[in-house]
Amino acid sequence: MERFIENLMYTSRWLLAPVYLGLSLGLLALAIKFFQEVFHVLPNIFDIAEADLVLVLLSLIDMTLVGGLLVMVMLSGYENFVSALDITDGREKLNWLGKMDSGSLKNKVAASIVAISSIHLLRVFMDARNIPDNKLMWYVIIHLTFVLSALVMGYLDRMSRYEKSKAA
């Protein structure tokens, strides 16, 4: 009975495969919105104010960072929790594949969230005169919470790696 339960639990990791595949649909939706924004701004490029263009570009950068985050979570999550990716050497292989454990993935995700939050905060500050002070304060507090969380996660990861190397 114990062996059956263990095998069932181990096999159940494959339930994550369609979830990771579903993230690729999210990536497709993000790409569609990205190009929708590009096609929306291009016809008006000579009429748009510089500040508005910067806001659009920040939005595009934001979407690009989210897309990179999706790819990172999809591929490394699949590889860490479902199965190793069997990519032939002749194809373009991302150099970080197979090297990112769940701790590294968490740190990369946290760093990406901080970068995305930074871009969003910059976009908010570009329009600060139209946003109430208390709302600006909350944007900054939330961003600093992301930064602090990323720093603490990085510190804890470093400490656990240090403890592992010390024990070895």
Swiss-Prot record:
Which organism is the protein's source?
Pectobacterium carotovorum subsp. carotovorum (strain PC1)
Q: What is this protein called?
A: UPF0114 protein PC1_0431
InterPro entries in the cross-refs: UPF0114, UPF0114_bac
Q: Where in the cell is it found?
A: Cell membrane
Asked if the keyword Membrane belongs to this entry, the reply reads yes
Q: Which residues cross the membrane?
A: 15-35, 53-73, 136-156
Write down the PANTHER family for this protein, in alphabetical order. Answer: UPF0114 PROTEIN YQHA
Bilayer topology reads: Multi-pass membrane protein
Chief location of this protein? membrane
Member of which family?
Belongs to the UPF0114 family.
Q: Which Pfam families match?
A: UPF0114
